[in-house]
Amino acid sequence: MDLLSRARKINAMLQTATGKSVNFNEMSASLRDVIRGNVYIVSRRGKLLGFAVNQEIENERMKSMLEERQFPEEYTRGLHDIRETTPNLDIESTHTVFPVENKELFKDGLTTIVPIIGGGERLGTLILGRVNESFSDDDLLLGEYGATVVGMEILHEKTEEIEMEARSKAVVQMAISSLSYSELEAIDHIFEELNGKEGLLVASKIADRVGITRSVIVNALRKLESAGVIESRSLGMKGTYIKVLNDKFLVELEKLRSR
């Protein structure tokens, strides 16, 4: 396969990912087929976002690392020192992706490190591994192109997470602002007693203790439930089961308490 055809496969990977939830394992598999080597996409903190192997590595430590999807902290810190593509590192390198305890078995193992940069910051690292054959200039070009595509997808995912956080926070703030003073007071006492994200409580007991009517509690819970912030379910004489659905709710409630 010539360079142009291989580059087009990476480009197709970007077009396929557009508008969809990112699957870094699929991206790794595409890069593996194009570069013909083992591919690991590692986040800035060492989380293994995706991987695909061309050659299986029979090593318990490596298997455990892939299952846990986490690279060692010391190794990850070392990757941050590499600021540009560094090709064909041998088994003696501290950055080798091959198990050093099996040096004889992987004495011809070569590792290439490609930083993933996006929006002016280090987002992670693309690690390529191959045995017996060094990475050519064409491979490095494709690796850097692949890292750029992966970086775009990581940025896209981060943007979506930020937008989702903002939406969740806005929903909670609107729900809380819809409560009357007495309803807000009731909610404060309810979740103080609940002391967590879910649990069982008896509304009438809280109403008697705080000195508010049961209807105030019911209305307050109904407003939060209609906003999708909580779910509640009556269990008859046992009380009412309440579960927080929006993680931002308890945070915002705590802010109100500290004012």
Curated annotation (Swiss-Prot):
Residue range(s) of DNA binding per entry = 203-222
Q: Which residues form a coiled coil?
A: none
Recorded GO MF terms: DNA binding; DNA-binding transcription factor activity; GTP binding
Name its cellular compartments: Cytoplasm
Q: Which residues carry this modification: Phosphoserine?
A: S215
In this chain, the stretch annotated as GAF domain covers 1-155
Q: Known Pfam families for this protein? A: CodY, HTH_CodY
Grouped into one coarse class, the protein's main location is cytoplasm
> What GO biological process, any one, is recorded here?
negative regulation of DNA-templated transcription
Disulfide bond positions: none
Q: Which GO terms describe its cellular component?
A: cytoplasm
Give the family, as the similarity comment puts it.
Answer: Belongs to the CodY family.
Q: Sum up the protein's function in the record's words.
A: DNA-binding global transcriptional regulator which is involved in the adaptive response to starvation and acts by directly or indirectly controlling the expression of numerous genes in response to nutrient availability. During rapid exponential growth, CodY is highly active and represses genes whose products allow adaptation to nutrient depletion.
- For this entry, the protein name equals Global transcriptional regulator CodY
